[in-house]
């Protein structure tokens, strides 16, 4: 009886090791492919929120890291993509976090010119409720397009709220928390951009590590 138990235990252990090794091999085999798909998706989004006709540089390669937990909703350094034309700054795209979504963090990216005009906003990742909060995805709703061409200023940032809170933006039926959190993140981030964009364009490029991130 004891030998049978030991034998079965060894078989189970061996099976578990084989399964673990198989999962590790699959993860390793697909890691580069997933990273490449993510890079291509980011490139596609950058083309949407910072139009090619306003810049002539490689936007994806013109990246710096910045850090401000209060403005960006996270302690991690976040990428900023700097757009220029004839070596003159024209616009940027910045990733940011809305930490107070209904189901946690919402990661988004904002394209904005140097005068504060929003060129586009897109949702990168989220866990909001399907059919309600997921209207922050462009494929589910045109809501994110309501940011297009709006000019942000510190004096008028009280308008960057949902209508229920006295602002200019629609909320979602049955889901006010998600758009409210989204708008707070956009507003905080644009204030941060306005205060720092001139300095960012004078920074050395590099997003491979946190060495160039703001402290």
UniProtKB/Swiss-Prot annotation:
Its cofactor is FMN. GO terms for biological process: electron transport chain. One of its GO terms (cellular component) is plasma membrane. The keyword Transit peptide does not apply. The chain crosses the membrane at residues 9-29. Pfam families: FMN_bind (PF04205). GO terms for molecular function: electron transfer activity; FMN binding. It is found in: Cell inner membrane. The keyword RNA-binding does not apply. Its main location: membrane. Keywords: Cell inner membrane, Cell membrane, Electron transport, Flavoprotein, FMN, Membrane, Phosphoprotein, Translocase, Transmembrane, Transmembrane helix, Transport. SMART domains: FMN_bind. It comes from the Bacteria. It is a single-pass membrane protein. The modification FMN phosphoryl threonine is found at residue 176. Its EC number is 7.-.-.-. The complex is composed of six subunits: RnfA, RnfB, RnfC, RnfD, RnfE and RnfG. Part of a membrane-bound complex that couples electron transfer with translocation of ions across the membrane. HAMAP family: RsxG_RnfG. Belongs to the RnfG family. This is Ion-translocating oxidoreductase complex subunit G. It comes from Shewanella amazonensis (strain ATCC BAA-1098 / SB2B).
